């Protein structure tokens, strides 16, 4: 029979091994200082095999002393000096158009130094990889750029916003990348640049230790669930006492934090 400690360790391993790159924290671990993996993302999404990633950072905090600051999931720079912000969004509410606009603007203000000319402003790409097709046209990619209404020509200001629909998982290069985002086993990944890191994170002791915050998040969720369960049990016992003392359904609902349906069910059991 497993001890509590061994059982908890087994559960944690299961949690880690069930993670995929659509999990924001796990994606961060997969791409942290991993130029090759970041390069795959950018090359496939932009359709450019010549992109060379110079550096990649996760959870980059950009301070705005005059307004809203932001923490970017993934921030990469390529050999041409272009900046790429990649955000994974499982919630539709996390990927509104104005958020993409704001992220594009803070990249501009952060990377143009006071002594630089406007012409030196680097090209920026804000890429939202969404769990659902938030723009609702069933396209795999949505490339969004400013244009001139009168002649439909692009307004070349160097800013790019891209939405990637992760529901489109066909046999194209992009579709296979989307398949990999939902894959939990290294051996089943299409892109080998992801496999080695995933193998390390999921199946090595050092990798498990590296994922401390994921484990802590799991433990916090577990503790919260236990606390809620304990509180619920206390509320049930309290409600039983009120009903046994002849208090009304309405009074018991008001004071026990249980729903009316739950209190009525308790009352029917007590009177049975």
Where do the protein language model's features map onto the residues?
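Short, charged alpha-helical interaction segments and adjacent helix-coil junctions
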Residues: 2-19, 77-79, 84-89, 175-272
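Pocket-edge structural micro-motifs
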Residues: 128-131, 165-166, 202
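Low-complexity, glycine/alanine/valine/leucine- and proline-rich hydrophobic stretches
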Residues: 148-157, 162-167, 177, 181-186
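Accessory alpha/beta interaction modules
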Residues: 1-157, 170
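Active-site-proximal helix/loop capping residues that flank conserved catalytic or ligand/cofactor
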Residues: 25, 39-40, 98, 125, ...
């Amino acid at each position: 029979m497993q001890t509590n400690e061994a059982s908890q360790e087994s559960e944690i391993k299961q949690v880690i091994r069930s993670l995929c790159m659509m999990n924001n924290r796990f994606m961060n671990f997969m791409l942290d200082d991993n130029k090759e993996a970041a390069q795959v993302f950018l090359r496939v999404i932009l359709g450019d095999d010549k992109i060379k990633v110079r550096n990649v950072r996760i959870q980059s905090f950009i301070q705005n002393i005059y307004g809203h600051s932001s923490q970017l999931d993934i921030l990469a720079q390529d050999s041409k000096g272009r900046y790429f912000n990649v955000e994974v969004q499982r919630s539709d509410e996390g990927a509104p158009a104005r958020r993409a606009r704001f992220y594009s603007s803070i990249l501009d203000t952060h990377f143009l130094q006071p002594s630089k000319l406007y012409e030196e402003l680097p090209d920026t790409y804000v890429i939202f990889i969404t769990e659902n097709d938030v723009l609702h046209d069933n396209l795999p990619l949505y490339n969004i750029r400013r244009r001139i209404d009168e002649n439909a020509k692009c307004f070349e200001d160097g800013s790019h916003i891209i939405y990637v629909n992760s529901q489109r998982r066909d046999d194209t290069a992009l579709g296979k990348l989307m398949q990999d985002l939902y894959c939990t086993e290294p051996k089943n990944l299409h892109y080998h640049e992801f496999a080695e890191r995933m193998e390390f994170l999921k199946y090595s002791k050092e990798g498990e230790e590296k994922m401390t915050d994921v484990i802590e998040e799991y433990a916090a969720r577990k503790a919260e669930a236990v606390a809620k369960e304990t509180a619920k049990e206390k509320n049930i016992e309290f409600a039983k006492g009120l009903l046994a003392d002849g208090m009304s359904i309405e009074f018991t609902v008001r004071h026990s934090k249980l729903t009316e349906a739950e209190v009525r069910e308790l009352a029917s059991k007590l009177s049975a």
